[in-house]
């Protein structure tokens, strides 16, 4: 059975989110309807609602084109899809988590409607055939000018932004480099440096936007250098909101951040969530402002 669900009929959503649960007869499903808010479109009570997956139990589903408003994909959303061959990733997708294909048959084909909108595809890069297909001679996984994985590079790792347009989430998770330097102006993402083993991260003069949770969680990180002399936007999320600098570091770990710009973006700096374990080295001109809006130790460059 091949089912195509239109976006709407007479301005209303066509189906509720439980419509395909345990429908083993479906082989192909193309969903155009928009119903991202699970409870908003469910016709069942909260107790009866199966919140894990819209297609859970579709054991014969081979082709699945997801609804355009789907923003993330995890193992629960494909649970039990044991015949899956092709999955179409919609334009609105932001994150495909590491465990995405752990509870279903691993697809043989992944189609991206707009790859440039994605920020994390850890689940896809764990597919052996996909990783092999896009691994370069230097061991890096690169697709459509986006750096997906740096491989197990050691020493000093330099990423040149003239060739790389975006650095995805968890791109350095397998890297053994102690120093990471990013030049040019590639776009960074949430979790770009998460789980890296670096002691020092250096961001080049053309990088002015530090996405929300860009540095993620790191047990070894000692220094961050922001070389830009322009206004730095801290913690910009995918919805355009300012979340400030949010670092996950062990309680015993101290971190030094060197900011070379004497320009100050108040709206994003006042959202910083770092404490006195973080020492910020800034130009004298903006020391007072950093002391006013953050809980960090502030010293002059």
Show which residues each predicted segment covers.
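A structural signal for leucine-rich repeat
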Residues: 55-56, 78-79, 101, 215-216, ...
